């Protein structure tokens, strides 16, 4: 009888301890109290993931083909060389948060879903508009859902996946469907991944005020704490030597530079100790032809074009200011010999349309091509014609573009030249 009473008392204490630990964990990481849909909306690179008809967008890295994930959980694949538009549907394809095409491969699309990662194997020569669910490979791991971010190694050999509820990011060997968890306690999960174009490093953002950069050879990492909030977004220079990132609650762009190590120092991340502010995007009033406009605020997402010469930042408007709108700011950039970031201008949609997602075409030959997905469901492609400073003017793949004279075309018909 005494033993039974002792067991009851011990059970009550154990239950109370579990509740206390759960409460403490929830207070440290409040996102864990959110439902899956709200959690995805909180960490998505789309401005209004829950309400917009377009939830994710991904260019193929080598061809003019892109995938669009829609509100109804379907994915459409568009190709400039084909009138066929495959529509991808699967019973596990719910709440798509991110997509990524496998590099050096024509036909594999990774999709971040609520309960798993789906790998669609699409025959580029097929005329079918409804590939069967048998074309999709399922990658799932206990406790790793919802999946909010994906990143392929530039070589295509590995796939990373991240979930805000899992403190480990997973490194998948797609051929065997096996994964290795890269565990790092603290941070409360992983929300966003960005693999550097040179393949040397990976940015891993967390729901708390800290982010990590992993080097992709020995898989060691360095951590950087932020003062005000979590890392919201980030992008790499083409050579992987510089990371630009933003912090939730701040209207600035930060820069971190990285050194390249060899010999005994190989395997170290090599990041600078502190980040420097390279742009202040605080709200400012501009006089335009249409009156006074308030522009500026927090950066929700950011992309750097493959040449490293144009940067686009999606700036959220202030909800407390009616005149403030969500816009896309475009900058001219140079990474060497010294880093430069100069404003080029802004992109705004038609009345009632706000930008939701942005992406640069990975292999545009005449400068940079920015894709903008709008809240109305429209997708627009905005060209910036320039001769890349990385290539000589006579390079056949980067031939200069001749501007139209005023006598041969009106101003409205002229292409947008950000640099001649």
For each predicted feature, which ranges?
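WD40-repeat beta-propeller superdomains and closely related acidic/aromatic-rich repeat-like regions
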Residues: 1-420
């Amino acid at each position: 009888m005494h033993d039974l009473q002792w067991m009851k008392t011990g059970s009550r204490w154990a239950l109370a301890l579990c509740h206390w630990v759960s409460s403490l964990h929830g207070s440290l990481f409040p996102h864990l109290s959110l439902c899956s849909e709200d959690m995805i909306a909180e960490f998505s690179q789309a401005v209004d993931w829950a309400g917009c008809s377009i939830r994710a967008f991904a260019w193929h890295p080598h061809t003019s083909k892109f995938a669009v994930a829609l509100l109804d959980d379907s994915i459409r694949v568009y190709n400039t060389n084909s009138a066929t538009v495959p529509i991808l549907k699967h019973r596990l394809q719910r709440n798509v948060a991110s997509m990524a095409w496998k590099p050096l491969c024509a036909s594999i699309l990774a999709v971040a879903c609520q309960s798993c990662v789906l790998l669609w194997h699409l025959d580029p020569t097929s005329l079918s508009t409804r590939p069967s669910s048998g074309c999709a490979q399922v990658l799932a791991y206990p406790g790793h859902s919802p999946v909010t971010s994906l990143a392929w190694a530039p070589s295509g050999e590995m796939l990373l996946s991240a979930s805000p509820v899992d403190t480990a990011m997973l490194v998948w060997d797609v051929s065997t469907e096996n994964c290795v968890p890269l565990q790092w306690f603290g941070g409360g999960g992983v929300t966003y991944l960005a693999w550097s174009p040179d393949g040397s490093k990976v940015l891993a953002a967390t729901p708390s005020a800290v982010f990590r950069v992993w080097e992709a050879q020995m898989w060691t990492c360095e951590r950087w704490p932020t003062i005000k909030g979590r890392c919201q977004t980030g992008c790499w220079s083409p050579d992987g030597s510089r990371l630009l990132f933003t912090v939730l609650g701040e209207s600035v762009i930060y820069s971190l530079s990285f050194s390249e190590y060899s010999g005994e120092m190989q395997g170290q991340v090599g990041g600078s100790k502190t980040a420097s502010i390279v742009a202040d995007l605080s709200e400012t009033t501009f006089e335009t032809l249409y009156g006074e406009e308030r522009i500026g605020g927090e950066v929700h997402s950011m992309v750097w074009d493959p040449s490293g010469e144009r940067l686009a930042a999606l700036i959220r408007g202030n909800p407390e200011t009616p005149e403030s709108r969500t816009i896309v700011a475009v900058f001219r950039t140079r990474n060497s010999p010294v880093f430069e970031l100069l404003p080029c201008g802004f992109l705004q949609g038609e009345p009632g349309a706000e930008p939701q997602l942005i992406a640069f075409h990975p292999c545009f030959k005449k400068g940079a091509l920015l894709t903008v997905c709008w809240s109305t469901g429209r997708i627009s492609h905005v060209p910036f014609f320039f001769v890349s400073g990385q290539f000589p003017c006579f390079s056949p793949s980067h031939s200069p573009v001749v501007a139209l004279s005023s006598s041969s075309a009106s101003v409205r018909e002229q292409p947008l030249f950000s640099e001649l």
